[in-house]
Amino acid sequence: KHGIQSTIHTGGPSIPGSGLIDKDVVLEADADIIGHINGGHTSLPEAHVCELCEKSSRAIEIVHNGNEKIAIAAAQAALQLKCPHRIILGTDGPAGSGVQPLGMLRMVSLLSSLGNIPAELVFCFATGNTARIRNLNCGLIEVGRAADFVFMDRAQHTAGRTLLESVQLGDIPGVGMVMIDGIVRCGRSRNTP
């Protein structure tokens, strides 16, 4: 009604004095986004996470600072339910787990390699899906959208012959340049493989 988007915490307590937000609370709240469905820090049981994917029609946020096994299970459940358009990725940082500068790329690599999900689809979770669901002006290449780009390639000496193949094998891409609002903000770091 007022253009405000709601996200619900999912899983164990995040700060002292808070409590568990279980599947029943998440379903009853019916927030726009099931926040860190794989926990932040502590995840719900896998069966409950899969039930949330099935019984809710809302966005499913999978995060770096959560349970990796449950991250894969949530993504696979959404794919089996034929709703990959609901999956968005995040880091859940900064948080008690700290800040992970490559958290999004690590999530893409994790879900692709260990979850056996095509890398190009996981990149879509991180970019286009997230942009659409969170109403962002980035994440998609279209006239009128922000000119924000990350130029990357396969890491040197990876077993993968292409960027996508190297990600599917579990390697993190080498970032060559970041452009925000059409302006180059940074180039390759000294440590980029």
Please place each PLM-identified region on the residue numbering.
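C-terminal cap of metal-dependent C-N hydrolases
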Residues: 147-193
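Extracytoplasmic/secreted proteins and extracellular or luminal domains
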Residues: 27-30, 104, 143, 171
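Electropositive phosphate-/nucleotide-binding environments in soluble metabolic enzymes
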Residues: 43, 47, 68, 72, ...
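Short gly/ser/thr-rich secondary-structure transition/capping motifs
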Residues: 15-17, 131-134, 159
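His/Asp/Glu-enriched, well-ordered alpha-helical/loop segment
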Residues: 76-155
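Residues embedded in well-ordered beta-strands within globular domains across many folds
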Residues: 35-38, 123, 151, 179
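Active-site core of metal-dependent hydrolases
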Residues: 1-98
